[in-house]
Amino acid sequence: MSFLVAIVGRANVGKSTLFNVLTNSRDALVFDFEGVTRDRQYGQAKYDDLGYLVVDTGGISDQDAGFDEFMAKQSQMAIDEANLVFFVVDGRSGLTSGDEYVANLLRQKDKRVVVVVNKVDGVEEESAMAEFYELGFDKVFAVSAAHRRNTQKLLDKFLKKPLNEFYRDYTQTQEHKEQQRHGIHFSLIGRPNVGKSTLTNRMLGEDRVVVFDMPGTTIDSVSIPFERHGHKYTIVDTAGVRRRGKVKQTLEKFSVIKTLQAIQDSNVVVAVVDAREGISDQDLSLIHFAIKNGRALVLAINKWDGMTEEDRNLVKQDLKRKLFFLEDYVDVHFISALHGTNVGHVFESIDTAYACANKKITTADATRLMQLAVEAHSPPMVGKFRIKLKYAHVGGHNPPVIVIHGNQVNRLPNSYKRYLENFFREALDFRGTPIVFEFKQSENPFADRKNKRIKDEGSKSKKTK
């Protein structure tokens, strides 16, 4: 599981601006599933190297019907899921009935809430904050998200402690220990109704997950340990148990949060795609999130049975066009979860991807491969600078991290970095896992001696004078 920060508040108070500050990016994950609130944003953030998820829940209003009511339900689910809630208000506009409506929702939850008084640039902070204490929360803090004023202080004061406590407690939980014991931990991700639960049942060989043919009815994710051919696994079906009723009110959006958390907790991610619908932007968002988190990856193109040869060729062309960045290393399987076709091959790829992600490489081997790559294709000259790669070593596993030391490595072009990745991948036969390269500038061992000599010469010249 991941620590979750929910940003809530009425419309136009600066929630998205605060979201961008926390995630340090405008590349939010935006999902548009059927039955899902539009333009919801999910992002990753870090504080002192501790990762957490951020969700911008959209504006809550006190309207009783229609889209606003649905938005309010979405935001209430965000509150339920969150470890910390940033309740954003507008310091210029002052306290409104909309703020009071949101505060009333929050008071019904036993959550850690910080009232973030935004847009205080040009306004005296204490006076801007004063009236918001009327909302009944003891933690009130003023920021200007647009100018990043006090935003770091906000995190230092209110995020640091609960985030550190979360990570400390999580590593001690039984859930974490069970996850470590049950072999390869993999998750099935994908849009609603692509067949994740059917594939779960096929993999387990029994109907452990109740499935109805209704998109948008996700309630929770299900984690199940099992064994197959003597190998231990834990499977997470992010679709989980489905129910018939309340399709419009069911908050499928928050299966997205569970999906993102499942990706982060997994050793291997199986992305399930409906062959008849093809690859969507949502599929690409989930796949990119998995790669960004360094997860090993397998693709399962489901509902392949019953398609004409012409349609199959069109699907393959579409996959090649949209997933060109994966074709060198990710296994793609065309399956029928319902009939079991090729599901066994998915297991083979899961095993291979996991083994590659955790492959042991010595410093000698890493350096030797780097030298072979340089001999075959030297780093380019960058202006008057000659880039020299000296040695390499492994910096981590799952994903594999290769650390390369050298001179002028900060000038190494991306094209050469891609060349190194492809060279290492082919030489080590890495399938299914991304490889992370880190480049570190080698320190000049004579720099201190040179600086000392210059300092000494300076001292002598002063004495001479």
From Swiss-Prot:
Tree of life domain: Bacteria
KW GTP-binding (keyword) present: yes
Domain EngA-type G: residue ranges: 3-166, 184-358
Keyword field: GTP-binding, Nucleotide-binding, Repeat, Ribosome biogenesis
InterPro entries linked: G_ENGA (IPR031166), GTP-bd (IPR006073), GTPase_Der (IPR016484), KH_dom-like (IPR032859), KH_dom-like_a/b (IPR015946), P-loop_NTPase (IPR027417), Small_GTP-bd (IPR005225)
Pfam families the record matches: KH_dom-like, MMR_HSR1
One biological process term in Gene Ontology: ribosome biogenesis
Binding site for GTP 2: 190-197, 237-241, 302-305
Gene Ontology MF term list: GTP binding; ribosome binding
Binding site residues for GTP 1: 9-16, 56-60, 118-121
Limits of the KH-like domain: 359-443
The keyword Hydrolase is assigned to this record: no
Family: Belongs to the TRAFAC class TrmE-Era-EngA-EngB-Septin-like GTPase superfamily. EngA (Der) GTPase family.
Free-text function comment from the UniProt entry: GTPase that plays an essential role in the late steps of ribosome biogenesis.
Self-association state and partner proteins as the record states: Associates with the 50S ribosomal subunit.
Name listed for the protein in its UniProt record: GTPase Der
Source organism of this protein record: Francisella philomiragia subsp. philomiragia (strain ATCC 25017 / CCUG 19701 / FSC 153 / O#319-036)
